């Protein structure tokens, strides 16, 4: 890891626009991209590919320490393209099998510690955009610029509904809203790494704002913070 490489953390609840803004910032700045929300799914898929037993903490930990994963800027439907061992697995990691496996591997403390180190290794020149839920509080607490994106539960449910509809899924918006509210409650009150803004984070409420407006606010804050850090 290069401590000199700047890192911008982007935290917040699901549907607040983190993925899209992270992609656009990485493109604009020409920096590396980390989608921490996908990394446990990627590890689970790697375990499945290599026939590693999901109950074997030692083997999963070893796999996590050497996980060959890259995150590239994607497109409108998938803002982040996930590459595992040279293969595009953006769609593969979204299956229910992978989701269930991710929950299993995430339960191991040694696996979580290995993935924490692996995530920090993404901090390389010229810089890193780190998208997640505890990037500014746990993974990169000394990051020079931290953003926290949020939006009303109703707006986030509508965004998720539109996204899934565009992909051909038949979804119920009331159920999506209920799931978002439940997840918010769970994430914000969990004992380890709760979903809260870092004390020095710049909070952007994306409700009613277009992508360009949010991007402009983010870039203005990042430029100010990086200028004062140099």
Swiss-Prot record:
GO terms for biological process: nucleobase-containing small molecule interconversion; pyrimidine nucleotide metabolic process. ATP binds at residues 12-20. SUPFAM superfamilies: P-loop containing nucleoside triphosphate hydrolases (SSF52540). InterPro entries: Cytidylate_kin, Cytidylate_kinase_dom, P-loop_NTPase. Its EC number is 2.7.4.25. It comes from the Bacteria. It is found in: Cytoplasm. It catalyses: CMP + ATP = CDP + ADP; dCMP + ATP = dCDP + ADP. Keywords: ATP-binding, Cytoplasm, Kinase, Nucleotide-binding, Transferase. GO terms for cellular component: cytosol. Disulfide bonds: none annotated. Belongs to the cytidylate kinase family. Type 1 subfamily. This is Cytidylate kinase. The lineage of its organism: Bacteria, Pseudomonadati, Pseudomonadota, Gammaproteobacteria, Alteromonadales. The gene is cmk.
